[in-house]
């Protein structure tokens, strides 16, 4: 489903829950717009970064960028940093060193996408890697029971999906122009690399 389709589905959901003529329709739409940052300069930020911190590579020669500013934003990123640092098949890598401009349809403005990982393997092939939970790589599923909490969660998932689609479209275009492979790495792929969490 396209981003426009998902946002449209959200609006249909609001209209189904709050009939036309109800003052709640406009309140809900304005609330949604505020939450995703359409009418102000804030960006909606999820609170799923409970595990973050600074990280220092052991193989400084492999790292491209300022090694004193490496921040992992999840235990998945930390594991992948360690994997990149130890893996002899990876000759160079960087964290948030590739910045890709994109247009965020959810906010109606230009943004910058800081790619989680840029890496180069021993064959010379470069990759952009984004680390995401599997659930954020698929369109959100409308909850069967639309409680207030479920509606809010669903709206947040729609926003996240919309932003991810915009970022990944821009990243794919840049990658294609530069002969770089773009990959989204989920918990499934990390487990194949040895992640035990």
What annotation goes with each model-predicted range?
Residues 14, 25, 29-197:
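Electrostatic, structured charged patches in enzyme active sites and in nucleic-acid/phosphate-binding
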